[in-house]
Amino acid sequence: QTFRKRRWRVFRNAERPEKILHYTATVMTPLYLYVLIASVSVPLLFTVFFMDFIKRWSHFLISTSIVAVVFLIWDALFTMAGIWGFNEDYCLGLSILMMPIEEWLFFFVIPFCSLFTHFALKHSAPNFFLGENITRKIAYLLIAGTCLLLCTHFSKAYTAVDALFLIVTLTLGVVFYLKLLQRFFLSFLIILIPFFIVNGILTGWITDSPIVWYNDLENLGIRLTTIPVEDIGYAFSMLFGNLMIFEFLKPKQDVK
């Protein structure tokens, strides 16, 4: 009951956008946009070598759009509740539902880069995947650990919602997409390298103040340099969610 009252106060007192669409004329440097452009430029240069991925653009757009809608709703609610927010000095100045346009683009650019990396690894290292037994064990350990985290930190909004998403994503993976998970567990470790670079820049590696800030009262308060540890689970849920839908739309073929 105490938690429900506290959480209600968070959302009741949340800042409500006066306008759905908002534009700020004064912009310091649209660094957020530059980060997205730099992120997408590398895979775009090499897409010619992976024509199978290019041929499935419609599947990519569908899967990414579905996941983006879910995560944007989460994003908007947390932004309005003050659980995280954005520094407009490093954005173009155009905001929708209190989120800069760059944040909307994030949910299309990052999945594209990450899925491209996954399929590039599949193409160049076809034997780069785990066995079924070890994959199940890793998934079960992660699910159990995340369930424990959810139970012990249910009052922290980001930690709790992030844990819930991760539990659902891993469970779906084990039950329906085990072969996909066998490969993604390893490719995710590679994907985390550029993901941490992007997130590091967004959370203050090279700027006086972060482009994306977090209210540490609503997370564990554990940072990997400047990045909240919850962002790892966030990234996994977003990217593997994209991949599951992407493969679901695929004609009847092996999804390893």
Indicate residue ranges for each PLM-predicted region.
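Hydrophobic transmembrane alpha-helical segments in integral membrane proteins
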Residues: A25-S39
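Hydrophobic cores of alpha-helical transmembrane segments in multi-pass inner/ER membrane proteins
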Residues: L36-L44, W104-F119, I167-L172, E230-F246
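Short, hydrophobic transmembrane alpha-helix segments
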Residues: L45-S58, T152-S155
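A generic, lipid-embedded transmembrane alpha helix
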Residues: I66-I83
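Short aromatic-rich membrane-water interface segments that cap or initiate transmembrane helices
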Residues: C91-L105, E218-G233
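Membrane-interface capping segments at transmembrane-helix boundaries
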Residues: H123-N127, E247-K256
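Alpha-helical transmembrane segments and their membrane-interface exit regions
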Residues: F165-F176, F195
